[in-house]
A protein has these predicted regions:
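Extracytoplasmic cell-surface/polysaccharide-interacting catalytic and binding patches
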Residues: 1-97, 101-171
Length: 171
């Protein structure tokens, strides 16, 4: 309803160009499950898989066919990208979302292998320290929660997003 949207706008200090009504239940989730701290000291167990994973319609077409998020996160992302589109930013896409423990383990090991090739004299601890500057061990990644996305509008993840018009709008 209009009253609910107005109350939300007042609470968050923002007004929106899109009609937020269909998204309000998703962007104001009160379930503690959506307030989960995941990092190097608060790990997810290896068998943790969110039950409500759903495909994101905003997946970048140069990687996996689909990216998944928890339902509320997917709907909140949909609202965010709809609002971005109202400001002319239509090219931001999801490059990574949910990752299983096993997939995060695979990625971390691939990154370690790549760094070993680049730094053949480095110890395992040094290699791990390098990789930990841009990736995390399995269980430590917010991606496993299904609540996290990586996204950008660049042809390569090696280019800085920070100076783009989209990043300035986001800030």
């Amino acid at each position: 309803s209009e009253d609910a949207e107005e109350a939300y706008a007042q609470r968050v200090g923002k007004s929106y160009r899109i009609d937020m009504t269909p998204y309000l239940a998703y962007v104001t989730a009160s379930d503690e499950e959506y307030l989960r701290l995941v990092n190097q000291t608060h790990l997810l167990p290896s068998d943790y898989v969110p039950e409500d994973l759903t495909d994101s319609i905003h997946t970048r077409k140069d990687g996996r066919d689909t990216q998944q998020l928890r339902l509320y996160a997917a709907k909140a992302l949909e609202a965010f990208l709809a609002e971005a589109a109202e400001y002319g930013h239509t090219d931001v896409t999801v490059t990574s979302a949910y990752r299983s423990y096993a997939y995060q383990n695979y990625l971390f090991n691939v990154y370690c292998d790549n760094e070993r090739k680049a730094h053949p004299d480095a110890s395992d601890a040094e290699i791990e320290a390098i990789v930990l500057t841009y990736s995390l061990k399995p269980g430590m990644s917010e991606h496993q929660s299904g609540l996290c996305v990586d996204m950008h509008n660049l042809p390569s993840a090696n280019i800085s997003f920070g100076e783009t018009a989209q990043a300035k709008w986001l800030a």
